[in-house]
């Protein structure tokens, strides 16, 4: 998947055996759950809990990859990496990109499925 791809529909469809109904259910569950997950990231950033922040970013990275959200996956990876390095300031700068990529992915999913 090329860098910068917001939504890899072909990839997610292949992983779900080209079942569009299942793809809609999986992506809707992701869209419903991720805003809460991002709020948890925000809480960990505010408290400076880098260990939990790293785990939470890793979780979002994996969920994003499973629904074809390549740009969001990359943004979550950047936050995970910053947290692992102990760089709270860098992790905080990652939050707005992560939120922006989630919004872009949401629009792409809603217009594609």
What are these regions (language model features)?
Residues 1-113:
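Two-component system phosphorelay core
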